Swiss-Prot record:
ATP binds at G45, P46, S47, G48, C49, G50, K51, S52. One of its GO terms (molecular function) is ATPase-coupled phosphate ion transmembrane transporter activity. InterPro entries: AAA+_ATPase, ABC_transporter-like_ATP-bd, ABC_transporter-like_CS, P-loop_NTPase, PstB-like. SUPFAM superfamilies: P-loop containing nucleoside triphosphate hydrolases. It comes from the Bacteria. The complex is composed of two ATP-binding proteins (PstB), two transmembrane proteins (PstC and PstA) and a solute-binding protein (PstS). This is Phosphate import ATP-binding protein PstB 1. Its EC number is 7.3.2.1. Residues 13-254 form the ABC transporter domain. The gene is pstB1. One of its GO terms (biological process) is phosphate ion transmembrane transport. Part of the ABC transporter complex PstSACB involved in phosphate import. Responsible for energy coupling to the transport system. The keyword Protein transport does not apply. Keywords: ATP-binding, Cell inner membrane, Cell membrane, Membrane, Nucleotide-binding, Phosphate transport, Translocase, Transport.
Length: 259
């Protein structure tokens, strides 16, 4: 058993009274939670429980779609990212996201990484090469692609493509990394590599992962949040959530009685 406790952690994200609406229908109900800095927090729960919706609030990606609204507070470093004055560009520089299905850009491996950087920073060619290498090393992909950086990224395997997407995200040096079912489309070997990478990423980033795979949550995360029908049922250190949950609903889900 570990000795983790949210009370002893430095807070990265504080959620207060968060509610979310699709077409005026409430899908998140009064969420209060603390995301600790440079830890891995897993969000679990049955399909439709609101876990991916919650993840998308953390970078306001919902704002791209009509009739979606978040109310309440999501404090990143003490500032409310839902406030009208908090710019989307600033938020994107702080919070990066990797999606379920890897989507490499139809360009070279090198350009996949450099493309996003060019929109945020002006770097010399040497600085860009160094940044691309750092990102690929950070995503545990450098050794596999260092001799083919000019080749198309679409020729990579599924697992390599997902690590490329992670590299593309961390190249911008965000503070928070959101992962939405990052291994659901991958084979077991690729999944294992991504899971190992996730545990390494927390040295530099605050990581939040949504997963249907409870074993993955147990293996990778420091803290776990269980959601059901738009509500946060329980949130605590992963060992306790999986071995001694305080709520019956949590125990029923983890033991397979529903979900």
């Amino acid at each position: 058993m570990n000795n983790l406790s949210l009370a002893n952690e430095k807070t990265k994200i504080q959620v207060r009274g968060l509610e979310f609406f699709y077409n005026n229908q409430k899908s998140l109900k009064s969420i209060d939670m603390t995301i600790p800095e440079k830890r891995i927090t897993a969000i679990i729960g049955p399909s439709g429980c609101g876990k991916s919706t919650l993840l998308r609030v953390f970078n306001r990606i919902y704002a791209m779609y009509p009739k979606q609204e978040a109310r309440g507070e999501v404090l990143l470093n003490g500032e409310n990212i839902l406030a009208p004055g908090y710019s989307m560009n600033r938020l994107r520089s702080h919070v990066g996201m990797v999606f379920q299905k890897p989507v490499p850009f139809p360009m070279s491996i090198f350009d996949n990484i450099s493309y996003a950087i060019k929109h945020h920073e002006k770097l010399s060619r040497r600085e860009m090469e160094d940044r691309v290498e750092q990102a690929l090393r950070g995503a545990a992909l450098w050794d596999e692609v260092k001799d083919k950086l000019k080749q198309s990224a679409t020729g990579l395997s599924g697992g390599q493509q997902q690590r490329l997407c992670i590299a593309r995200t961390i190249a911008l040096r965000p503070q928070v990394l959101l992962l939405d079912e990052p291994t659901s489309a991958l084979d077991p070997i690729s999944t294992g590599r991504i899971e190992q990478l996730i545990t390494e990423l927390k040295e530099q980033f605050t990581v939040i992962i949504v997963t249907h795979n409870m074993q993955q949550a147990a293996r990778c995360s420091d803290y776990t949040a269980f959601m059901f029908m738009g509500e946060l049922i329980e949130h605590g250190d992963t060992d306790t959530i999986f071995t001694k949950p305080s709520k019956t609903q949590t125990e029923d889900y983890i033991t397979g009685r529903f979900g």
